[in-house]
């Protein structure tokens, strides 16, 4: 089962839909970031956790940061936008305002390949929608940047 933590963002269901297209039999449980405790997450025994985008900062994202602290290294974690920032903050990265706000703007995204990005062109065009980033020089050693934009300084 995949547990998807919803940070009160409609894009959460875009993720659910896409995952269902990949595997229609995939068991996906969506919970709001303030509906479960960490112990209740553990009781559900997810195989993976996805943390969704949202309209706030990681500090304001319910259990998102604490979930990463508890399950990092034990379960595969994927963060999208705010979820990505929550993973970065939980592991010691500093979340800062992006030099340029990217609300609905397209950019070319480069990547290092690998399982997650397999089959995507390199680079590929993506729509970006964020105003916060992990400050690049604070990227925790446990994390590896596998995709980045062409925008320097704050594009990761």
Residues covered by each model-derived region:
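Amide-donor transfer/coupling interface in amidating biosynthetic enzymes
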Residues: 2-4, 11, 17, 22-46, ...
């Amino acid at each position: 089962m995949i547990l998807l933590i919803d940070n009160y963002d409609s894009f959460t269901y875009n993720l659910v839909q896409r995952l269902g297209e990949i595997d229609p039999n995939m068991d996906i449980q969506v919970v709001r970031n303030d509906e479960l405790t960490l112990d209740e997450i553990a009781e559900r025994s997810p195989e993976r956790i996805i943390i969704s985008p949202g309209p706030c900062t990681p500090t304001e994202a319910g259990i998102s940061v604490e979930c990463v602290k508890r399950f990092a290294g034990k379960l595969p974690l994927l963060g999208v936008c705010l979820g990505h920032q929550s993973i970065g903050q939980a592991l010691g990265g500093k979340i800062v305002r992006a030099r340029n706000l990217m609300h609905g703007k397209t950019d070319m995204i480069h990547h290092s390949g690998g399982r997650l990005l397999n089959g995507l062109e390199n680079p590929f065009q993506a729509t970006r929608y964020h105003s916060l980033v992990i400050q690049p020089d604070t990227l925790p050693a446990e994390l590896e940047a596998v995709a980045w934009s062409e925008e320097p300084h704050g594009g990761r």
